[in-house]
Design a protein with these regions (language model features):
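Active-site nucleotide/adenylate-binding loops and adjacent lid/helix of ATP-dependent enzymes
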Residues: 1-75
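Short beta-strand-to-turn element immediately C-terminal to the catalytic PLP-Schiff-base lysine
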Residues: 16, 43-48, 81-83, 150, ...
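A short, glycine/Asx- and small/polar-enriched loop/turn
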Residues: 24-27, 83-84, 151-156
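Phosphate-binding site of ATP-dependent enzymes
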Residues: 47-128, 156-157
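Short small-residue beta-strand/loop micro-motif enriched in glycine and branched aliphatics
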Residues: 40, 111-113, 168-173
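ATP-dependent carboxylate activation and anion-phosphoryl transfer catalytic cores
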Residues: 7, 119-188
Length: 188
């Protein structure tokens, strides 16, 4: 709601609590995920109506509110923002499936390309949106914003903002900093 009211595009979707009906307008495939938490725990891509109850139950086991969104066939991009300025953009490419917990934390399961192989114009669009998210959330030091870029039309959709992203030497923000010539010691 905050992103939409700030003019930041998000995938079409609805927030549900237990017992709420899923509007038919969502259709399939769709993405079901807890409203809070992280690392894609409790997140499912649902391709058939009969799999929806199980996906909802899994998401509700993580949170009392669940988001059901239209599935968008897209490239996944992420960008850090430090002190209000967007950093290099990374494209995230899981070897299989989507960027779930396993693909995030098991070595070799995901390719992270920095800088992302997108046009200069698209880079600026993603960075500008990330800065707007940073401002809308009134973030202070740093954060990271995840986006989808629709493969059909290039539209950008904000998935989420991470207000305390990982800062290990192999985390995404340090990779962005390295692409800009900043070493890990300077960053931290």
């Amino acid at each position: 709601i905050l992103f939409r009211s700030s003019g930041i595009p998000t995938p079409p979707g609805v927030t549900l609590r237990r017992g709420d009906a899923v509007p038919e307008s969502i259709g399939f495939p769709c993405v079901v995920k807890p409203c809070s938490g992280g690392s894609s725990v409790g997140t499912s891509i649902v391709t058939e109506p009969e799999k929806l109850p199980g996906a909802l139950e899994e998401a509700f086991s993580c949170d009392e509110a669940v988001l059901v969104e239209k599935y968008i066939r897209a490239r996944e991009l992420t960008v850090g923002v430090m002190d209000g300025r967007a950093m290099a953009v990374i494209e995230i490419i899981p070897k299989t499936g989507f960027y779930d917990y396993k693909n995030k934390y098991q070595a070799g399961f995901t390719e992270e390309i920095c800088p992302a192989p997108i046009s200069a114009e698209d880079t600026v669009r993603v960075q500008h949106l990330a800065e707007r998210v940073y401002e809308a959330l009134h973030l202070d030091a740093y954060g990271r914003v995840d986006f989808l870029m629709d493969k059909a039309d290039g539209e950008l959709y904000c998935l989420e903002a991470n207000t305390l992203p990982g800062m290990t030497p192999t985390s995404l923000i340090p990779q962005m900093a390295a692409a800009e010539g900043m070493d890990y010691g300077e960053l931290c």
